[in-house]
Amino acid sequence: MIEIRNISQRFAGPRGSVEALHNVNLSIPAGEVFGIIGRSGAGKSTLVRTINLLTRPSEGNIVVNGRDLTTLPAAQLREARREIGMIFQHFNLLSSRTVYGNVALPLELAGMKRDEIEANVLPLLELVGLTAQKDRYPAQISGGQKQRVGIARALASKPKVLLSDEATSALDPETTRSILDLLRRINRELNLTIVLITHQMDVIKQVCDRVAVLDAGRVVEEGKVIDVFLQPHHEVTRALIGDVIAQELPPAMKARVAERLKTGSGHLLRLAFTGSGVDQPILSETIRRYELDFNILHGQIDEIQGQAFGSLAVLAGGEPAKVAQALTYLREQGVVVEELSYVE
């Protein structure tokens, strides 16, 4: 569906050329919700704007539905862009037009007849839950409703791809959840491919199938959301998921744990469980089988796309040989085990 091939983007700066993207390669299958996350300035918005060539890359190719957009002449590019909708952090609604009028605008500009416009707009308003608000003006509806108008407007041309650039970052948590639920429902009902840009890992957790982590214009990690959450490899990924899965020990415990690590009287472990392992007595069975002491420092259980996962930080005490055997056993049970030689 979407192939991002060797994309680099450079801009002129006061001190010379600035590279916003460096050799980015991503493949996004049809019907997937794909998240791109990173800190401010990582290049997220620049990358998503290359997908519909709002920003033309300095190098590389963008292939959507088998067509290389970077090689298309202007008329064919305009046609191809009709298959790519986009929503933004700022709603960009026309204050002089009603909800209905804002959604109808791109169809009017395309020269569609009035009865055809109505036949397209009314189902979209029903889809996004705004049928009752169709005659209201932007000033008369909430921020979440404005974003729903933006989504309906982006879907008016019946695109195959929807790009979302920080579309929920200006919304409160409850409204954010409702918008993400709507995007997921649209993805399933319309088989719409969605590329979602955000700086919030909780957004990725709620709605995305896979995720790419961007840092300084480079993809530093990519994979299924559940895998990235349970076993983050890059330090940027660890920092981004810190508010979703507790990665750090509470400050009050750090000194005590550090002292035990110095004396060799304990092993600091991070354990991650998923699927059926979340509600199985794996830890208690390990303690009994290998005669270990496990001090649970912190833990939590959450859910990603209907799949339960859990994370524990434990300080294990016991004979080194038995600790090693216990870690092997845990891994055999499907537990992700990370041995830490220091206190973060």
Swiss-Prot record:
Protein name: Methionine import ATP-binding protein MetN 1
EC number, as in UniProt: 7.4.2.11
PROSITE patterns named among the record's database cross-references: ABC_TRANSPORTER_1, ABC_TRANSPORTER_2, METN
Residue stretches making up the ABC transporter domain: 2-241
Species of the source: Paraburkholderia xenovorans (strain LB400)
Enzyme class: translocase
The family this protein is said to belong to: Belongs to the ABC transporter superfamily. Methionine importer (TC 3.A.1.24) family.
Location, primary (coarse class): membrane
Subunit structure: The complex is composed of two ATP-binding proteins (MetN), two transmembrane proteins (MetI) and a solute-binding protein (MetQ).
Record's keyword terms, sorted: Amino-acid transport, ATP-binding, Cell inner membrane, Cell membrane, Membrane, Nucleotide-binding, Translocase, Transport
SMART domains referenced in this protein's UniProt entry, alphabetically: AAA, NIL
An example molecular function term from Gene Ontology annotations: ABC-type D-methionine transporter activity
GO CC term (a single one): plasma membrane
